[in-house]
Structures are given as C-alpha cells and as structure tokens.
Amino acid sequence: MARGRKMSKPRAVEAAAAAAAVAATAPGPEMVERRGPGRPRTNGENVFTGQSKIYTYMSPNKCSGMRSPLQEENSVAQYEVKCQGKPLAGIYRKRDEKRNSGNAIRSSMKAEEQKIKDARRGPLAPFPNQKSEAAEPPKTPTSSCDTPNAAAAKQGLKKPVRGKQAPRKKAQGKTQQNRKLTDFYPVRRSSRKSKAELQSEERKRIDELIESGKEEGMKIDLIDGKGRGVIATKQFSRGEFVVEYHGDLIEITDAKKREALYAQDPSTGCYMYYFQYLSKTYCVDATRETNRLGRLINHSKCGNCQTKLHDIDGVPHLILIASRDIEAGEELLYDYGDRSRASIEAYPWLKH
C-alpha cells in the first residue's frame, strides 16, 4: 500500500501540469464574452465552444474530493476551437437569398400566366375552377327527411357544369359565320357594261353611220325668214350623234381659191366650214348641192347641237351631236362661230 501511494504522487503531478498547460492556451472569460459564442473571426474561421475533460490516471477508488482544485476547474472549463473554412453564417445567408429569389420568380411567373389566362378568357367569362357564389346555395345540415331536397340541390349544383359548354357552341358558331359566301353560292359576274365598253360601242356605231351615209330622225322643212331648215322627227338625247356635216375635205390653200370663185356669184351662198386638226387647218366644202341634210342646218347662238371632230383611220370628219335633249318637232340649230365684220355685213343673221 505504501508503494502504491508513492507511485500516485508523480501521476498526480503530471496531470496537474497538463491541466495547467491547457488552461494557459485556452482564452479567458473576457475574450469569450467579447467575441461572443459561435461568432466568426475576421480571418474566416468559425469559433465553437466545448468542454474539455482531463482524465486522471488516479485510481478509480479515489473520490473527487481528493482531486486538486486545478483539476476540478479544468475538468469543466470551456474553450474555443478553431475550424478552418468559410463562415457558416454567410453560407446560410446565401442559401436563404437563393431560396427567396426562387420563390419570387415563381410567384411572378404564376401571376403573368394568370393574367394571360384572364385576358384570353375575357372580362365576363368565369374562371374554370371558380364556383359562382350565387349558384351555390348555403350549406345546411340535412336530415333523413330532407333527402328529396338534397337530391334537387345536387342537380342544381350540376347545372353550372352544363353551362361550361356554351362557349364551345359560340366558338363553333363563329367559325361557321366566318365562312365565305362563295362556299354556298357561285360567283356572279356583273352583266353591266363598263364606261369604256359603252364608249367603244358608240364609236363603232358612229363609224358605221358615217361610212354608210345614213341620216335618220330628221327631215327638211321651210322655216319663216330662213328658208330651208332641218326638223327633228325623233327624240335625241344629250351627247347623241345627230348628223355629219358632209362635204369635200380640203386644205386651207384650196379653200381660199374656192371661196374667191364663190364670191363672184352672190346666189351661191357659203357652205364652207374651217377647223384645225393636228395643228393643221382644214375645210369642209359643202357648197355643192347634195341630198345630205347636215349642210342645211341653220345658225343660232343658242343652238341645240354642236360640232365635233371624229376621225376614222386618221381622216377627220365633222359631225353634229346634241348639246341637250332634243324633242321631236324641234328645229336643229348650231352656232357657226363666225363673228368677223365682213361676214356679219354679208350675213346679218349671224348676230342671232
């Protein structure tokens, strides 16, 4: 026993020295309080608090009362442990930020999808999963005697489901309305002639009348104070062809020679009509007596006919057309257009 006691002294001394060394390396309470438990250091190290135990080499039969005060203090002492790595607080904070940002993005995407669905559905269309509060009756406790009412209520709740098919029917109706009319009826072409076609037909008719020499719808009659004149026997519409002023088509040089010869005989009269065509002066000489009626139409400043040039294959023809609607029985008149002093002195009726 005495030998065992002697051997325990060096072991106790060694344990006390080890506890003192650990206590010297551990920070004091002031440092722990100032930094705070679990607070990260500035160099990126995390600090953890823990408890250190010094297992003694003493015999287990010895009680704690025989331990030195230094051993008891160090057995429950708290100290800080350094852990190399990134701060855990920063890692947790970044994870929370990513989670929050993901939730915000998902919520914004859901809101945009809902807006698009609302725009397609229209302002008056109900949501597909939304039940109308007016159609849904308030829930009341039902008893065994109210089973018929419960069945009727269930049928009433099923009615809105039938109403959901109405938009489909409307959509089908719209597609039917958008069909073309030509799908049901053939395309009809207008039988009315265009303005160009009418003008072409009228021109061909005038060509035939000029070339054939037909003069219809008029006759020769004696007019008081004028002599012979032409009377309409049918109605002429405005712009309609009446008659051609037919005669010899000559140039200005030949016309002057003939006019000098006609002036020698006062009973001959003047039946020469001058006009310009393609910047050149021509004359229609109708002095020679023929059965054509155009040369016998008298003069008037307020006539119902007017002259017009009509070419056939490059050859000009002088024709008379109705300047207004002409009734049957009216005398055909047109303005000669000669206002020279010599002509008025020779033919005073040119004033009227």
From Swiss-Prot:
Entry EC no(s): 2.1.1.-, 2.1.1.361
Biological-process GO terms, alphabetical: cell division; negative regulation of transcription by RNA polymerase II; peptidyl-lysine monomethylation; regulation of DNA damage response, signal transduction by p53 class mediator; regulation of transcription by RNA polymerase II
One annotated Gene Ontology cellular component of this protein: polytene chromosome
Domain-related comment: Although the SET domain contains the active site of enzymatic activity, both sequences upstream and downstream of the SET domain are required for methyltransferase activity.
Chain's role: Protein-lysine N-methyltransferase that monomethylates both histones and non-histone proteins. Specifically monomethylates 'Lys-20' of histone H4 (H4K20me1). H4K20me1 is enriched during mitosis and represents a specific tag for epigenetic transcriptional repression. Mainly functions in euchromatin regions, thereby playing a central role in the silencing of euchromatic genes. Required for cell proliferation, probably by contributing to the maintenance of proper higher-order structure of DNA during mitosis. Involved in chromosome condensation and proper cytokinesis.
Claim: Lyase is one of the keywords in the record: no
Compartment(s): Nucleus; Chromosome
Record keywords, A-Z: Cell cycle, Cell division, Chromatin regulator, Chromosome, Methyltransferase, Mitosis, Nucleus, Phosphoprotein, Repressor, S-adenosyl-L-methionine, Transcription, Transcription regulation, Transferase, Ubl conjugation
Reactions performed catalytically: L-lysyl(20)-[histone H4] + S-adenosyl-L-methionine = N(6)-methyl-L-lysyl(20)-[histone H4] + S-adenosyl-L-homocysteine + H(+); L-lysyl-[protein] + S-adenosyl-L-methionine = N(6)-methyl-L-lysyl-[protein] + S-adenosyl-L-homocysteine + H(+)
Superkingdom of source: Eukaryota
Name this protein carries in UniProt: N-lysine methyltransferase KMT5A
Region (Disordered): 21-51, 87-202
Subunit-structure text: Interacts with L3MBTL1. Interacts with SIRT2 (phosphorylated form); the interaction is direct, stimulates KMT5A-mediated methyltransferase activity at histone H4 'Lys-20' (H4K20me1) and is increased in a H(2)O(2)-induced oxidative stress-dependent manner.
Disulfide bridges in this chain: none
Source species: Bos taurus
Similarity comment: family membership: Belongs to the class V-like SAM-binding methyltransferase superfamily. Histone-lysine methyltransferase family. PR/SET subfamily.
Record-linked InterPro entries: KMT5A, KMT5A-like, KMT5A-like_SET, SET_dom, SET_dom_sf
Gene of this entry: KMT5A
GO molecular function: histone H4K20 methyltransferase activity; histone H4K20 monomethyltransferase activity; histone methyltransferase activity; protein-lysine N-methyltransferase activity
PTM-bearing positions, type Phosphoserine: 59
Organism placement in taxonomy: Eukaryota, Metazoa, Chordata, Craniata, Vertebrata
Entry comment on modification after translation: Ubiquitinated and degraded by the DCX(DTL) complex.
Residue span(s) of domain SET: 216-337
Basic and acidic residues bias spans: 109-121
Binding, S-adenosyl-L-methionine: 226-228, 271, 298-299
Modified residues annotated as Phosphothreonine in this record: 140
Basic residues composition bias: residue spans: 156-172
